[in-house]
Structure formats: C-alpha cells, structure tokens
C-alpha cells in the first residue's frame, strides 16, 4: 500500500511538472505570435537568437548544478532548517559561479553575437544586456523553487510556475509593444524579480525560509559589480569599456574564487582536474 501511495504521488508530481512545462511552451508560442503580428518575422528570429544565447550557456550551468543539488535537497526535504541552509548554500555557489560569466557577457556580448551569428544580429544587444541582469534573480529563484519538487508538493509547484508564466507573458507583451526587442529584455528582468519575490514568500510562509547574511553579502557585491558593468557598456565609449570591464571581471573572479575556496576548496578541485589531464 505504501509503495502504491508513493507511486501515485510520483505520477501526480510528474504530471504537474509536465503540465507546467506545457504552459511555459504555450506562453512562449503566444509571445512569438504577438511579436510576428505586432512587429515582423525578423524580430521573432532576433528574439529567439538572443534568448538562445542566454538560455543555452547559462542553462548548461543550471543543469550541471541541478543534477547534484536536487538529490541532496530531497534527502533533507523533511527538515525545514536543513532545507534553508542547503538553499542558501546553493544560491551562494550559483551566484559565485555565474556572476563573473554574466559580467564578462555584458562586456563582450557584441563579440559573442558576431561570432555566434553575425553583425546583422547586433540589434539584440540591448535585450541581452537587460536579460543578463535578470539571470541573477533567476539563479536564486531557481534554487528556492527546487524545494517544492523536493517536498513533493506537485500542486504548489504547478501553480507557482503557472502564475510565473502568466505574468512573464503579460510583461513580455507590454515590453515588446512599448520597447521593442530591448523591452523584452527589460520584461525578462522584471518578471524574474517578481518570480523571486513570489517563491521567496511561498517558501517563507510554508517552510520558514529566509536568506542568510552570507548570501545577501554575495548577492549585493556581485550584483553591484554587474550593475557597474551594465553602466560601463551603456555610458562609456570603447576602448575604455573593455579596460574598465576587464577590471570588473577580474574583481568578480577574485571575489568568487576567494568565497568558493572557503566553501568547496576550489583550488583542490582545479588541481585534481589538471592532474587528470596530465595523466591523459
């Protein structure tokens, strides 16, 4: 009977995840139709290209972290305090890994677009700038939202994702209507700020979740560095953009290395990887 009950709850969970995934796809499809009708087919291509860059490279990091993070969170799912500690730890590590990459992305996005596509796609830079800032909020909300899966609350997970998809679509429609492609980047940032507030309050009310002081410190420092990078690309002319940008990237890398070393011993990990390559 216990096995049947567990199997049933897993089936319900799987169904809810699939359903929320379907709603996300429908929202993305409706947005593409709107862009095509309001703007043109070229803008649909530009939109897809911009978010492919962001989602592909950042998504790889999320996937790699998720394979290790979800099983560990599932083990402590019944203990709210341990869940809180693990979510904070994962949020810290996600930010420490992502922040230098995102800041480098802000500074060198033009080159990335030209290398991956062509100079004809440079009209998406504004959209990518704003969306890159949104990844900071996506990373943290991603770490929190996993707790709904770990605790097996399928309905809560579904409604959380459902409302997220609804306002993501609404903000994207408004963003494109009033701001074109750049407006889509701004709407991405706003949507993930709201989504983070949403998952934080659900986790706080249901599981007494709160952010640790060390997480807040990392978030503020790395986000301020990213904001400085954002200001540099918007306000300062080349080649000074790259000079100041490299300084910001260097500081972010140094800070991330220092913090990661105290948490997971990153120096030993790097040495281990290098030794494996030497043996090959």
Residue ranges of predicted features:
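Short runs within selected transmembrane alpha-helices of multi-pass transporters and secretion channels
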Residues: 20, 24, 28, 51, ...
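Alpha-helical transmembrane segments of multi-pass membrane transport and lipid-handling proteins
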Residues: 61, 87-138, 169-177, 234
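Interhelical loop/hinge segments that connect adjacent transmembrane helices in multipass membrane
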Residues: 1-28, 68-85, 206-220, 266-271, ...
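Helix-loop junctions and terminal segments of transmembrane helices
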Residues: 50, 54-91, 98, 145-150
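Hydrophobic alpha-helical transmembrane segments in multi-pass integral membrane proteins
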Residues: 25, 169-173, 224-239
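Membrane-proximal transmembrane or re-entrant/amphipathic helices at the cytosolic face
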Residues: 230-280
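Transmembrane helical elements of multi-pass membrane transporters/channels
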Residues: 4-71, 134, 138-141
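Residues that define the loop-to-transmembrane-helix transition and helix capping
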Residues: 42-45, 88, 122-125, 154-155, ...
């Amino acid at each position: 009977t216990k096995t049947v009950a567990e199997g049933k709850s897993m089936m319900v969970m799987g169904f809810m995840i699939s359903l929320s995934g379907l709603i996300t796809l429908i929202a993305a499809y409706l947005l593409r139709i709107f862009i095509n009708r309001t703007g043109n087919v070229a803008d649909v291509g530009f939109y897809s290209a911009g978010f492919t860059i962001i989602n592909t490279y950042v998504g790889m990091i999320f996937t790699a972290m998720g394979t290790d993070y979800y099983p560990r969170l599932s083990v402590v799912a019944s203990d709210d305090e341990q869940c809180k500690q693990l979510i904070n730890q994962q949020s810290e590590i996600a930010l420490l890994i992502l922040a230098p990459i995102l800041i480098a992305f802000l500074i060198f996005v033009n080159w990335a677009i030209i290398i991956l596509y062509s100079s004809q796609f440079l009209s998406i830079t504004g959209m990518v700038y704003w969306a890159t800032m949104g990844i900071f909020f996506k990373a943290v909300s991603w770490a929190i939202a996993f707790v709904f899966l770990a605790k097996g609350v399928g309905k809560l997970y579904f409604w959380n994702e459902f409302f997220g998809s609804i306002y993501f679509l609404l903000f994207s429609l408004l963003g494109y209507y009033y701001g074109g492609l750049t407006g889509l980047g701004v709407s991405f940032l706003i949507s993930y700020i709201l989504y983070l507030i949403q998952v934080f309050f659900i986790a706080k009310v249901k599981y007494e979740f709160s952010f640790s002081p060390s997480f807040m410190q990392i978030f503020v420092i790395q986000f301020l560095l990213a904001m400085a990078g954002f200001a540099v690309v918007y306000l300062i002319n080349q080649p000074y953009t790259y000079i100041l940008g490299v300084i910001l990237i260097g500081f972010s890398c140094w800070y991330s290395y220092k913090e990661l070393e105290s948490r997971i011993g990153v120096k030993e990990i790097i040495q281990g990887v290098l030794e494996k390559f030497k043996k090959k």
